[in-house]
Amino acid sequence: MALSELEKKRQENIRRNQELLKKLDLDSISDSIKKEVDNKSFSSPSSQKRRKTTKKPVIKKEISEPSRRSRRIAGIKSELEDPKQAARIREEEELKQHRKQELERLKRTRLFGDFKLIDLITNKKGDMIFEKNVMDRKLSHIGLDSKVEEKKNEEDKEDEEEAINIDENNRVLQLVQSLGDKFSAGDFYEEIRNSQTNGNSKDKSLDAKRKEFDNLNIYPRFDPLDIKICHNRITSMFFHPSTTNRIVVGGDTTGNVGIWLVDEQNNDTKEEEEDDDDDEPSISILQLHGRNVSKIMTPTFSPEKIYTSSYDGSIRVLDLNKLTSTELLYLNEPGAREDIALGVSDINQCQDSSVIFMTTLDGEFYQHDTRTPFNTRQRHHLATKDLLRLHDKKIGGFAVNPNTNYQIATASLDRTLRIWDLRNVNKSVYSEFENQKSPHMYGNYNSRLSVSCVDWNQENRLVCNGYDDNICLFDYSGGSKLDNELPVITEWKSDFVPSTKSSEESELLPNNLTPFTKIKHNCQTGRWVSILKSHWQTNPADGVQKFIIANMNRGLDIYNQDGQILAHLNEQVGAVPAVCTLHPSQNWAVGGSASGKVYLFE
């Protein structure tokens, strides 16, 4: 029978493969491998190399007490034999556990009264070095026994390190005090004058400004990983207006406030200055609050003072001259216990330098005259009439019109941005809460998701951003961005309402604020990164109105007031500098990350 063509090809492939295997000589290789394996497996024990072992010195351990002991041997009677003793032991254990829980709770509360800054210094672990002094003050304030055991270090080496840490922080605070003496209101004459007038200077060429920002570089003196200004995730950042002795201040989620003297050297002697390896940033971290630090600012006419606000309901004043921390104000729920705080979400100063505005986590507004003394021994209960209802949910941030002292804009978790007139206060119309008062609302902007922040510049432009991944710019300078023919916002009457679209007139809450441009921007920070917030430069020396916002791709973006990008700074940025700000007058930028580290561009 003749073979088919397919069978012939198969036979030819078999023959070709056999010839190829013969050429490779695989049989001889397998035989050699087998012989080597057999020789190794049957080799004599003497031919194998023995492993050298080094005898470890025998350490005689001292006989320690057993971890578990019989209650009978210890002389402790059972509950059945002596129920009174058992009840007493149980009561002592419960009391000890309750006291421990109370101390942990007190650590998260605000500070009571005034302190020297050296008492609030923290170590590298974030614990207060003089925690006993602070906790005793808190315990005595609430009427408990003020006996807190001091933490004892297990090794003398740790004691020495603590002493070195105290000396170093004390030296840095002395530097802060020396810098505070150099500040005066006259040093910031131009900023003060410009903050009270509405500048109308034209912007420079866009290309020229971009080239200027191209020259900004990361601060070269230290590695950004070595500039740790806070122990935990940064929630607020402040650049002091000084241009000669620069100070950067940051606050974190646990109430720590870090002060970085940018231009100061950490070494005193010439020998130490010559050794670059020993040079470290001049940073002191203070425990000023018990919860998130929401805002840090400096009064216009008192550059030696720094105001800090927190979710623990307190506002404190840090004096760089006296090296003290004083409680300016504490807010608590109207009619509630003193320890139920009304968290402060933001603070701002108006044209009247003695009055500060603040908003709360519950959507309320409050103003306080700093000339009114705050008595820590008396409970500062707010009446409902003292608070103005602006939103029914958290106010993430607000801004005051720098050209007036009665117009404010608020951004809220309820997905709205609103502009208010504080001159006209009546019964609240748009709140679901009963018996509330609110100022007159000019208008409202509805967003798809929550609005994180809003800021107001000298030329009556507003910027806001939120979780809808948009940066919105509003123009109320009387221009023709939207051809709405609105007068400049400073001329609006106390009952003025911008016109609404016909399709929206039936809605109770108007939607009559319209941005003239929207910029796409990723604001999805997630759980471990602070919320992105855009901020205007308050008094730009170059006359160009600009704002800064962090970029989720580990950088900083700077735009002008028309929405044109001026810079994208990302040199050596290893994390998202979510909380950022510009120097009030100079084109220096700083941003803080979730690990407490700072990136400075100059």
From Swiss-Prot:
Native source organism of the sequence: Candida albicans (strain SC5314 / ATCC MYA-2876)
Keyword DNA damage set for record: yes
InterPro entries to which the protein is assigned, alphabetical: WD40/YVTN_repeat-like_dom_sf, WD40_repeat_CS, WD40_repeat_dom_sf, WD40_rpt, WD_repeat_DNA-damage-binding
Start-end of Basic residues biased regions: 48-58
Chain spans, region Disordered: 35-85
UniProt similarity note: Belongs to the WD repeat DDB2/WDR76 family.
Keywords, in A-Z order: DNA damage, DNA-binding, Repeat, WD repeat
Name recorded for this polypeptide: DNA damage-binding protein CMR1
